[in-house]
Amino acid sequence: MRRRRGSDSAAYEARTRDIVVRVFPTYAAEESSPEQGLYLWSYTVEIENHGEETVTLIARRWTITDGFNRVNEVEGSGVVGEQPELKPREAFRYVSNCPLPTPSGAMRGSYQMVTDAGDLFDVAIPEFSLHLPGAAMKLN
């Protein structure tokens, strides 16, 4: 995993085989209600195929940990209602969100991919921090 700093959010990066996954989390203050225990995080994911074969993202698995170290596992088909196909040197980008009951947490996971030849493999999604600036960090 590699972490890069951007102008207003950090970028987290992981590479599995020839697939690069970058995540850019941001706090959605206007959609959050801290007084009701709702902290909404938006995250943009970029998936790049640097390989020589076409791959299709068929499933996702997330591990979400809140500030009290409670873990929630989420699995499903594709991402944002799609099973994107990435040809060599193509990329796919999507935006999703994650509500937390605490001002800090973390997410990590994996995508299941399949090649045109039918080979299945998992691609790591880098662990990334969901931490409201100024909030006490309870993870780690």
From Swiss-Prot:
SUPFAM superfamilies attached to this UniProt entry: ApaG-like
Annotated InterPro entries: ApaG_domain (IPR007474), ApaG_sf (IPR036767), Uncharacterised_ApaG (IPR023065)
ApaG domain span: 13-137
GO biological process, one term: error-free translesion synthesis
Protein name (database record): Protein ApaG
Species: Caulobacter vibrioides (strain ATCC 19089 / CIP 103742 / CB 15) (Caulobacter crescentus)
Lineage, broadest ranks: Bacteria, Pseudomonadati, Pseudomonadota, Alphaproteobacteria, Caulobacterales
Gene label: apaG
